[in-house]
């Protein structure tokens, strides 16, 4: 904890480069309509706060470390809480994660509501079949909340890792990844907005425990902000893309009134029927704009008195041409039908091609739109890729999740020593913002990708973007991606698997490796392959391994002492106890006191 003014956050130390951060500039904070509600909260609670005010329903099954998201939401609902549209939401706990996702998908298919599930690790893999179907059915307004956790391999582990998020990549979700509780909350709101615009479901991820259980200062999105920013999921909006207008767009009042006349022609005088048809045709382009209903009143002269009530209802409730429900209904519980029947080969491939070309391809622009709108309302700036100190940097630390906050602290320390290092934090994992990443890496000597998974999917995405930029330098084949004639060298630093501790000295070592002549391409932070044992037996075994696997000698970096990154006035408190003695609750309470009563910047983490 460090001292601060009670109601004002000091600006972060600047540099020659632009800072793109989720914390608002203090000067801007007073100017925006929704600066946020000050609180101290962990990531799970910050996400649940958004869900409480937005969701019409949640179907979830408990799994560490995301369980608390649904628990907090259900506690709010069970105590009589309603969402910002004055609707009482529902919650259901099924018998497993596969059923949870299937049920959430079914609820979302009924339209007119924001629906969520919360899951992690094996829970996501268990429901993976339903996740693919959820993305393929163009379900808008659905957000999967993820507290990212490793998938058990050589043993069980419930701590942080990106295996589960990477497993979702081929499903087609739009995937966001926050670095702290503030970003987890803000990106949750952005995820609902982008999903309702694109009709592609979204996943909002944060690191398990490192963010989900980490308490820090949060500016909660106000309920009124969420109501204004997201909009009622049951209301009508203009279709925001050509493909959506073709598939979902209403045919308009002219078509619907003529459809009514076809079913009621025998109830009309023939001459009056023809006159009414001519009247509608003459005013076809004005019918949708008849909000004052003057044309409606004029039309009644030809409508039989006994069906004028039905005619008025048809007129008033006809949907405007080209509009759709904000979250479209794809099934009707009152008229059950089949979705996703069996298709033969050409139809199935055509459906995939249509989905990717006409719907998924629109996601990047809708994400940018959602982020820009949110920035305007809150002052908290978001981009698919956030950059810090990159404009003048030669060396880049690139990552995703809580590690990027750590990387910023280490980068600040290194820059004070004259070392030109910057940080790139990926907020939109899928679809991967290749052009933004290339612009951030343009002209750099080297980049180290910080990977919280052994599958190194983020490295693969970065390498693919670099390859396409190199192709574009010779012949433009990939629109929008800047062409690079020289590429930075890319290294992969695997860290934090299963919550493995990451210290500042490890990131300093990653930087030193990057600027060295050797620049090892793949290594593990915090792990040692060989010990300094004096045992002859151990030394003999180690020599065998070194001889058989010589590459492992360089896969662990030498580290020095931890640099001192905290301000001099900061205080640190550490609790030691055994389970059941209320230590975590005491730590949370102390964090609240330090922030709310003493006005200190506060952060706490259970171990």
Regions found by a protein language model. Give the residues of each.
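Core nucleotide-handling region used for phosphoryl-transfer chemistry
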Residues: 417-446
């Amino acid at each position: 904890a460090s001292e601060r003014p009670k109601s004002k956050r000091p600006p972060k130390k600047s540099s020659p480069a632009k800072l793109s951060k989720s914390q608002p500039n203090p000067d801007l904070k007073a100017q925006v309509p929704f600066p946020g509600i000050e609180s101290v909260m962990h990531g799970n609670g910050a996400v649940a706060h958004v869900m409480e005010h937005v969701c019409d329903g949640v179907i979830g099954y408990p799994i560490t470390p995301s369980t608390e998201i649904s628990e907090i939401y259900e506690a709010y609902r069970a105590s009589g809480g309603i969402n910002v549209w004055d609707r009482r939401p529902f919650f259901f706990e099924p018998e497993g994660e596969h059923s949870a996702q299937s049920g959430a998908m079914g609820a979302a298919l009924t339209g007119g509501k924001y629906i969520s599930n919360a899951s992690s690790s094996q829970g996501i893999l268990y429901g993976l079949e339903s996740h693919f179907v959820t993305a393929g059915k163009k379900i808008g307004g659905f957000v999967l909340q993820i507290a990212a956790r490793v998938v058990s391999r050589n043993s069980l582990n419930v701590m942080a890792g990106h295996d589960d998020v990477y497993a979702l990549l081929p499903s087609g979700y739009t995937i966001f990844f926050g670095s702290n509780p503030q970003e987890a909350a803000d990106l949750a709101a952005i995820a609902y907005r982008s999903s309702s615009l694109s009709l592609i479901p979204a996943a909002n991820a944060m690191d398990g425990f490192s963010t989900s259980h980490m308490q820090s200062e949060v500016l909660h999105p106000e309920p009124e902000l969420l109501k204004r920013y997201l909009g009622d999921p049951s209301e009508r909006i203009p279709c925001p893309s050509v493909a959506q207008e073709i598939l979902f767009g209403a045919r308009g009042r002219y078509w619907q009134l003529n459809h009514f006349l076809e079913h009621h022609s025998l109830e009309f005088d023939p001459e009056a029927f023809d006159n009414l048809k001519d009247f509608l045709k003459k005013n076809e382009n004005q019918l949708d704009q008849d909000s004052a209903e003057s044309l409606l009143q004029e039309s009644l002269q030809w409508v039989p008195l006994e069906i004028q009530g039905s005619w008025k209802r048809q007129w008033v409730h006809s949907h405007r041409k080209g509009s759709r429900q904000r979250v479209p209904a794809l099934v009707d519980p009152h008229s059950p039908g089949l979705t996703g029947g069996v298709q033969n080969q050409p139809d199935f491939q055509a459906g995939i091609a249509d989905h990717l070309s006409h719907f998924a391809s629109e996601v990047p622009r809708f994400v940018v739109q959602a982020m820009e709108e949110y920035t305007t309302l809150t002052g908290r700036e978001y981009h698919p890729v956030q950059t810090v100190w990159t404009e003048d940097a030669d060396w880049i630390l690139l990552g995703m999740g809580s590690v990027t906050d750590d990387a910023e602290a280490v980068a600040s320390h290194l820059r004070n020593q004259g070392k030109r290092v910057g940080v790139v934090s990926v907020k939109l994992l899928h679809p991967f913002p290749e052009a933004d990443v290339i612009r951030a890496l343009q002209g750099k000597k080297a980049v180290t990708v910080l990977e919280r998974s052994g599958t190194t999917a983020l490295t693969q995405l970065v390498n693919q973007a670099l390859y396409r930029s190199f192709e574009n330098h010779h012949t433009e084949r990939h629109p929008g991606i800047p062409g690079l004639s020289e590429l930075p060298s890319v290294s992969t630093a695997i860290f934090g698997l299963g919550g493995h501790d990451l210290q500042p000295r490890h990131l300093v070592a990653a930087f030193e490796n990057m600027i060295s002549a050797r620049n090892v391409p793949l290594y593990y932070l915090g792990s040692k392959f060989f010990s300094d044992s004096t045992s002859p037996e151990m030394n003999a075994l180690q020599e065998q391994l070194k001889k058989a696997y010589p590459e492992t000698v360089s896969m662990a970096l030498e580290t020095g002492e931890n640099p001192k990154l905290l301000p001099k006035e900061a205080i640190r408190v550490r609790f030691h106890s055994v389970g059941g003695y209320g230590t975590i609750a005491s730590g949370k309470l102390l964090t609240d006191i330090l922030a709310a009563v003493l006005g200190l910047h506060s952060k706490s983490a259970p171990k």
